[in-house]
Amino acid sequence: MARINSNSGTAVLSRGAAVPAARRPASGTSASKISKLSSTGPPNAPWSKSLTIFKTFISVYLGQAACLAASSRISSRCIVCIRSTLFLTLFALNVAQEFVFGATPAPTVKTDLNIRDFSKSSCSALKYRIYVSSFVSVLNIILYVLLFLASVVYIRYLCHQSITTETVKDY
Protein backbone atom coordinates (compact mmCIF):
# COMPACT_ATOMS: atom_id res chain seq x y z
CA MET A 1 0.00 0.00 0.00
CA ALA A 2 1.14 3.53 -0.59
CA ARG A 3 0.53 6.31 1.86
CA ILE A 4 1.33 9.99 1.41
CA ASN A 5 3.52 11.72 3.94
CA SER A 6 1.97 15.18 4.28
CA ASN A 7 5.12 16.79 5.73
CA SER A 8 7.52 16.00 2.88
CA GLY A 9 5.06 15.45 0.02
CA THR A 10 6.30 11.94 -0.76
CA ALA A 11 4.46 8.67 -1.18
CA VAL A 12 5.83 5.85 0.97
CA LEU A 13 5.36 2.36 -0.46
CA SER A 14 4.87 -0.78 1.62
CA ARG A 15 8.58 -1.63 1.36
CA GLY A 16 9.49 1.76 2.79
CA ALA A 17 10.80 3.32 -0.44
CA ALA A 18 9.75 6.93 -0.84
CA VAL A 19 8.67 8.30 -4.22
CA PRO A 20 8.75 12.10 -4.59
CA ALA A 21 5.42 13.76 -5.23
CA ALA A 22 6.63 15.17 -8.57
CA ARG A 23 7.33 11.66 -9.94
CA ARG A 24 4.13 10.11 -8.60
CA PRO A 25 1.36 9.39 -11.15
CA ALA A 26 -1.77 11.48 -10.85
CA SER A 27 -4.26 8.63 -10.59
CA GLY A 28 -4.55 6.40 -7.52
CA THR A 29 -4.45 3.17 -9.53
CA SER A 30 -0.69 2.77 -9.17
CA ALA A 31 -0.91 2.41 -5.38
CA SER A 32 -3.67 -0.16 -5.64
CA LYS A 33 -1.67 -2.18 -8.19
CA ILE A 34 1.39 -2.12 -5.94
CA SER A 35 -0.58 -3.25 -2.89
CA LYS A 36 -2.30 -6.00 -4.90
CA LEU A 37 1.05 -7.30 -6.19
CA SER A 38 2.70 -7.21 -2.78
CA SER A 39 -0.14 -9.11 -1.12
CA THR A 40 -0.61 -11.86 -3.68
CA GLY A 41 2.95 -12.47 -4.84
CA PRO A 42 4.03 -12.95 -8.42
CA PRO A 43 1.13 -13.98 -10.65
CA ASN A 44 2.93 -16.73 -12.59
CA ALA A 45 5.80 -18.05 -10.47
CA PRO A 46 7.53 -20.56 -12.75
CA TRP A 47 7.92 -23.51 -10.39
CA SER A 48 5.41 -22.83 -7.62
CA LYS A 49 3.03 -25.59 -8.81
CA SER A 50 5.86 -28.15 -8.84
CA LEU A 51 6.94 -27.17 -5.33
CA THR A 52 3.37 -27.43 -4.08
CA ILE A 53 3.02 -30.93 -5.54
CA PHE A 54 6.39 -31.93 -4.08
CA LYS A 55 5.40 -30.62 -0.63
CA THR A 56 2.11 -32.54 -0.85
CA PHE A 57 4.05 -35.69 -1.71
CA ILE A 58 6.24 -35.21 1.37
CA SER A 59 3.16 -34.67 3.55
CA VAL A 60 1.65 -37.94 2.26
CA TYR A 61 4.96 -39.66 2.97
CA LEU A 62 4.82 -38.29 6.54
CA GLY A 63 1.34 -39.79 6.91
CA GLN A 64 2.61 -43.15 5.71
CA ALA A 65 5.44 -42.98 8.25
CA ALA A 66 2.84 -42.40 10.98
CA CYS A 67 0.87 -45.45 9.76
CA LEU A 68 4.03 -47.55 9.85
CA ALA A 69 4.68 -46.39 13.40
CA ALA A 70 1.14 -47.32 14.42
CA SER A 71 1.37 -50.79 12.91
CA SER A 72 4.85 -51.24 14.48
CA ARG A 73 6.28 -52.99 11.45
CA ILE A 74 9.43 -50.95 11.78
CA SER A 75 11.51 -49.83 14.75
CA SER A 76 10.59 -46.64 16.57
CA ARG A 77 14.10 -45.21 16.12
CA CYS A 78 13.77 -45.61 12.37
CA ILE A 79 10.36 -43.89 12.40
CA VAL A 80 11.85 -40.97 14.32
CA CYS A 81 14.62 -40.69 11.71
CA ILE A 82 12.13 -40.82 8.84
CA ARG A 83 9.81 -38.21 10.33
CA SER A 84 12.58 -35.82 11.34
CA THR A 85 14.18 -36.01 7.88
CA LEU A 86 10.85 -35.41 6.16
CA PHE A 87 10.00 -32.50 8.45
CA LEU A 88 13.42 -31.01 7.76
CA THR A 89 12.91 -31.39 3.99
CA LEU A 90 9.45 -29.82 4.22
CA PHE A 91 10.85 -26.92 6.25
CA ALA A 92 13.66 -26.40 3.71
CA LEU A 93 11.13 -26.36 0.87
CA ASN A 94 8.98 -23.78 2.65
CA VAL A 95 12.01 -21.56 3.25
CA ALA A 96 13.18 -22.01 -0.35
CA GLN A 97 9.76 -21.13 -1.70
CA GLU A 98 9.73 -17.92 0.34
CA PHE A 99 13.16 -16.88 -0.92
CA VAL A 100 12.66 -17.84 -4.56
CA PHE A 101 9.08 -16.78 -5.13
CA GLY A 102 8.73 -14.33 -2.24
CA ALA A 103 5.66 -12.43 -1.16
CA THR A 104 6.53 -9.33 -3.17
CA PRO A 105 7.51 -9.46 -6.83
CA ALA A 106 10.53 -7.76 -8.33
CA PRO A 107 9.84 -4.12 -9.18
CA THR A 108 8.87 -3.46 -12.78
CA VAL A 109 8.56 -0.38 -14.94
CA LYS A 110 4.88 -0.10 -14.05
CA THR A 111 5.35 -0.44 -10.27
CA ASP A 112 8.57 1.56 -9.81
CA LEU A 113 9.05 4.84 -11.63
CA ASN A 114 12.83 4.82 -11.13
CA ILE A 115 13.36 1.79 -13.41
CA ARG A 116 14.14 2.28 -17.09
CA ASP A 117 12.11 0.49 -19.72
CA PHE A 118 14.34 -2.12 -21.38
CA SER A 119 11.61 -3.61 -23.53
CA LYS A 120 13.10 -2.45 -26.84
CA SER A 121 14.23 -5.24 -29.15
CA SER A 122 17.76 -3.81 -29.37
CA CYS A 123 18.43 -4.31 -25.65
CA SER A 124 18.95 -7.86 -24.39
CA ALA A 125 19.06 -7.07 -20.66
CA LEU A 126 15.49 -8.22 -20.11
CA LYS A 127 16.05 -11.49 -21.99
CA TYR A 128 19.23 -12.09 -20.01
CA ARG A 129 17.38 -11.53 -16.73
CA ILE A 130 14.61 -13.94 -17.76
CA TYR A 131 17.13 -16.63 -18.76
CA VAL A 132 19.07 -16.30 -15.51
CA SER A 133 15.97 -16.40 -13.32
CA SER A 134 14.64 -19.46 -15.18
CA PHE A 135 17.99 -21.22 -14.84
CA VAL A 136 18.13 -20.46 -11.11
CA SER A 137 14.57 -21.75 -10.65
CA VAL A 138 15.32 -25.00 -12.48
CA LEU A 139 18.56 -25.42 -10.54
CA ASN A 140 16.73 -24.83 -7.25
CA ILE A 141 14.14 -27.51 -8.03
CA ILE A 142 16.85 -29.99 -9.05
CA LEU A 143 18.80 -29.34 -5.85
CA TYR A 144 15.78 -29.88 -3.62
CA VAL A 145 14.81 -33.07 -5.46
CA LEU A 146 18.38 -34.31 -4.93
CA LEU A 147 18.15 -33.30 -1.26
CA PHE A 148 14.96 -35.31 -0.89
CA LEU A 149 16.46 -38.35 -2.65
CA ALA A 150 19.56 -38.14 -0.46
CA SER A 151 17.36 -38.02 2.64
CA VAL A 152 15.48 -41.13 1.45
CA VAL A 153 18.78 -42.97 0.89
CA TYR A 154 19.98 -41.87 4.34
CA ILE A 155 16.72 -43.06 5.92
CA ARG A 156 17.10 -46.46 4.24
CA TYR A 157 20.67 -46.67 5.56
CA LEU A 158 19.53 -45.82 9.11
CA CYS A 159 16.68 -48.34 8.91
CA HIS A 160 19.06 -51.04 7.68
CA GLN A 161 21.50 -50.16 10.46
CA SER A 162 18.79 -50.31 13.15
CA ILE A 163 17.49 -53.64 11.80
CA THR A 164 20.97 -55.20 11.87
CA THR A 165 21.73 -53.93 15.38
CA GLU A 166 18.38 -55.24 16.69
CA THR A 167 19.06 -58.60 15.06
CA VAL A 168 22.48 -58.75 16.69
CA LYS A 169 20.94 -57.87 20.08
CA ASP A 170 18.35 -60.66 19.78
CA TYR A 171 20.95 -63.34 19.13
Swiss-Prot record:
Alphabetical UniProt keywords: Disulfide bond, Host Golgi apparatus, Host membrane, Membrane, Transmembrane, Transmembrane helix, Viral envelope protein, Virion
Positions on the Intravirion side per record topology: 154-171
Entry-linked Pfam families: Herpes_UL73
Virion surface side: 1-132
Domain of life where this protein originates: Viruses
InterPro entries according to UniProt: Herpes_glycoprotein_N_domain, HSV_GN
Membrane topology: Single-pass type I membrane protein
Primary localisation category: virion
Annotated compartments: Virion membrane; Host membrane; Host Golgi apparatus, Host trans-Golgi network
Any GO CC annotation of this UniProt entry: virion membrane
Family: Belongs to the herpesviridae glycoprotein N family.
Role description: Envelope glycoprotein necessary for proper maturation of gM and modulation of its membrane fusion activity. Also plays a critical role in virion morphogenesis.
Subunit structure: Interacts (via N-terminus) with gM (via N-terminus). The gM-gN heterodimer forms the gCII complex.
Protein name as annotated: Envelope glycoprotein N
